């Protein structure tokens, strides 16, 4: 695999999934910048006032805390990892078997931008 991201994208995705599967938000959040911007259709549903854009690490912690309260059986299985110039995409299946792609942009080793995208069933 040719990776141009200055981190081991596969190792990152494994740590990311392990932290999520342990429901350990602080371990997930340690990889995120204080000024991170994150979008997700789930955020739009759980936090309608955000218009699906979560701004800042504190707001992201709040969103993910609420998400874990609503999805107590949350579990991710990484299917594939893609690396770009300053980005990785983690393709995974969630606890319902749904396919999700998480796009993460890095700067100085921290995620500054993230986007959760969900497969639209045909």
Question: Where are these predicted regions, by residue range?
Answer:
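A beta-strand edge to alpha-helix "cap/lid" segment located at domain peripheries
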Residues: 1-3, 67-122
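Hydrophobic pocket/interface hotspot
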Residues: 16, 28, 36, 56, ...
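Short, low-complexity N-terminal intrinsically disordered segments enriched in polar/charged residues
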Residues: 1-30, 34, 110, 122
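A solvent-exposed, acidic/Ser-Thr-rich amphipathic alpha-helical stretch
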Residues: 27, 33-79
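A structural signal for well-ordered alpha-helical segments within the folded catalytic domains
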Residues: 7-10, 58, 98
